[in-house]
Amino acid sequence: AGAAGERRTGQLLETVASRGPDVLHDLRVPLVDYPVNIDHAVVSGRRVFLIDSKLWRPGLYWALGGATRRGLRPTGRLASRNMHMARDKIAAYLRRRGLPARVQTPIVAVWSSRPDRPVRLAVAGTGLRVRRAGALTRILPRRPADPAITQALARLLYP
């Protein structure tokens, strides 16, 4: 199911790329001793947006700085530690290369597993931007990418 969400986000991000930014898919997180990947990265100017794709069952998901819940039940669906770590490691990786990139707050792009029933989101205090995936076309900037940043991130692509 998760791969389906990643594919849908990838297709959506291609429309974003047609407006100027560069989009990369399936990057490894550098400077860690175990395999961690980033589903998508968007480079717009010197800004880098890391995006994790999710495919969730319909319902209301909410959090106020603690555990994410679906309705009243806790759910482990929001892996914020990995996204925070990925942001920090990508920023350090680019800094070591002397690149003036600004790695933004990670985005979690959520799709409903049932197109006829929505996922509703009220998630705050997690240090992540949790959004319906369709909103990516509105919230991501449209500037052409800094090619040096894209080139450095391309070295992290999984084969």
Predicted features by range, described:
Residues L50:
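Gly/Thr-rich phosphate-binding beta-strand-loop-beta motif of the actin/hexokinase/Hsp70
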